[in-house]
């Protein structure tokens, strides 16, 4: 029997979060359950994803009590700095799209096409460089 993975999308109502959802929809990963999180202001927003209607929920300090395997953070640096360590402390592997951890020596900065092996160095949080850097190192 295949394991089902739980993936939290933080910042799901924003531009980067919606782009992440679009990519995930294109990939149509098997054995994944999704939960969408957003700011208090955007809570209750309905988002069509994978043929279903999801309701984005406010991100709180208790949001990761559900036992997520992974989280994609696309809600800005302040949100990432506050909530990524909470998620990681509960066993969730965080992929952060903000600048919050890019200069942190304990957080690997990963471009999958360039240094995928560095993912193994994570302590619960993985950062990615900004879009200009990614283009420069991939080309």
PLM regions and their residue ranges:
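N-terminal Rossmann-like NAD(P) cofactor-binding subdomain of oxidoreductases
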Residues: 1-139
């Amino acid at each position: 029997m295949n394991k089902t993975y739980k993936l939290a999308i933080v910042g799901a109502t924003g531009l980067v979060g919606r782009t992440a959802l679009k990519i995930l929809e294109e990939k149509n990963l098997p054995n994944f359950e999704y939960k969408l999180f957003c700011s208090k202001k955007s809570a209750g927003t309905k988002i069509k994803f994978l043929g279903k209607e999801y309701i984005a929920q406010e991100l709180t300090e208790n949001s990761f009590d559900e036992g997520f395997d992974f989280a994609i953070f696309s809600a800005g640096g302040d949100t990432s700095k506050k909530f990524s360590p909470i998620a990681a402390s509960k066993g969730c592997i965080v992929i952060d799209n903000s600048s919050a951890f890019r200069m942190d020596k304990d957080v690997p900065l990963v471009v999958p096409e360039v240094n995928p092996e560095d993912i193994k160095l994570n302590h619960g949080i993985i950062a990615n460089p900004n879009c200009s850097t990614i283009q420069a190192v991939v080309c």
